[in-house]
Amino acid sequence: MIFLQNIYIQGKKNEKTTWWQNFINFVQQKFNRIKMEKIGDNSYLYTVSHLDHKNTLKQLEKKIQKKQGKEVQVIFSKEAEFLKKQWKGKKINIETFKKISLPLLLDYLLEQIQEKPQTLLLQDIYFCAKTLNEENKQIIEYFLEKVKTVNIVTTELKSFQKLEEKCGKEKGIWITVSNNKRKSLNKATWIVNLDFSAQELETYQIHRQAVIINCTEEKMKKEKGFEGIMVQSFDVNGYSSICKMLEGAFTSITLMASQFPLTLDYEENVRKLKQMGVNIRNLIGINGKINQKELLNHKKFLTNKNI
């Protein structure tokens, strides 16, 4: 059987990559069976025009991984439906990508709900974090000079107080660390949940008009009387043409997350995201897409309260 099949490869570059690229180009020219096109940093699109029992996709995948490294991610296009299942098994960290998107997402929300143009530099951001892992540490340090104040709400006070002291001594910027369930979030208008569970977040008294961005994949619950905005996820524009082939099978955030490494270099990944020209298309709340009416109502509240 002859059919067109695309394979998208993303992974770390190693010493054998150049040799493998040359091999692909050679095959392309001599046999017109495999074509290679570079579509990003360490990202290549392989087009296989003829497959038989001696040249299966599984064998091709193993061969490419052997030459480029085991950490590559392989994404199959939707021309062959059964291949979607293989792609679904790949390790893609949606939560990490949500965190990488925070600067983009906060700028988008500011534009949508603030009556007058404002920047992150004027905002007080509250991060809910129970674990001081390398990922959360990099995020907090990134925002230190990007916002007015960084506030940490955590159950692990000792760990974060050490970070508080370090930031104060080394950068001259002091963060606030607290765990008062009644007071810590009751005046916060910008809340970013890094790793609290829905049950843990429910134990805190939250400003009824807060904007909450949830970076976990667990669905948050809307408490009675809450009139703010809960961003559970979002859709994006600006990803590669190969990802567009898979739009019908996967969410845009999943497709975009597949283009980022599982290991976190937060500042570098934020820079990469901006260079790709990614834009927020829709905000998704706990009950589906957040419409313009909800955003407009929130803008009116902020204007009337002068927040």
Segments (PLM) and residue ranges:
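Adenosine-phosphate binding glycine-rich loop
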Residues: 16, 211-307
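Rossmann-like adenosine-cofactor binding region
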Residues: 173-242
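Metallocofactor- and cofactor-centric catalytic cores in central/energy metabolism, strongly enriched
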Residues: 5-20, 27-85, 110, 285-307
